[in-house]
Amino acid sequence: MAGASALLLTATTPAAANPNAINPIPVLNGTAGLPHLLGRTRAVFQVTGMASPNSTQNYNVLGTDLGIMWDNGNGEMLTAFGDTAGVGFPNLLAGSLWSWRSNILVRSHNQDPDNGIFFDSVVHDIFGQARDLVASPKIPLIEISRIPTAGISVNGVQYMSLMSVKTWDDVGQWTTNYSGLAASGDDGESWADLGFTHRPNEGGNANFQMNAFTKSGGWVYEYGTRSGRNNPAYISRVREEDIANLGEYEYWDGGKWKKGDVDAAAPIAENVGELSVMWNDYLGQYVMLTTDPFNSVVMRKASSPEGPWSDPEVLIDTRELPTAYAPSIFPYQTGRDLYFLTTVHNQYNVVLMRTSL
């Protein structure tokens, strides 16, 4: 197995971390049409970009990544995308020829993704362009980007967890300043950066720089990893009404929950990238999607939010789609079919995937 793993690593090129060295123009970037996958997963819809039925170029989104989806509490789906490229004044300081935004939001009422995900509206500026939700100076070594990693609705308020990126490092690696919450009371139109929720990239808080949310029994469960990919995953929880109060968070130490002690958190899974977690009615289990060290998209299952989590199952083999990252689960139940978004870095856009459970 060790020899096979080494061969696999040398045969593929994983997704880069730096989003500035990209080309989102179809054909010119070497891509045309949806990825052709032969395994258990199929690419079913181009969600963003010039080749998408959503025509996101109409609001100056030529390329983007992530696609973190959640229900706003009223049957509307909100989707936050990360670093976003368009035409306009280039962000040369960050090494990009594109006009850059770090976090944008679209809305949809699509609860059946079988024919795709279609957007109803976008948070935009006076020119109709998708705009940053939370401002970022985009200055290397200070804050080069502020990227959403999780979203959730609690008591009519929308919350996003964002990471403040200091530097882009080696392939699949970056360094953050901190993570923290932003909140919106108007369906994602305007956002307040909640500075008192910032987790500095040090000590136990370093394990919660990138997040995923799920809710159960009045609790919000927050999954966390260090900045970058191929790190252990951790979990905390907090009562819904206390989501913005870091002192009320409890951390799973491998056997019990410990309140207020972030250093007590023990790993619940190893070698993960960006995370997405959701209860699945068909399986009667929680499902976790992420990428593995070979850059395959993988799934784990568990009967409770803290686990124990199963060994990973490959949903998209890296040999079929080596630049895929950040799988994000569609937030509504869809029976035996599991739908999720995945970024394809070499086209720098987001694709809807479907796999049979």
Language-model features: locations:
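Beta-rich carbohydrate-recognition and catalytic domains
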Residues: 20-62, 71-144, 153-203, 219-270, ...
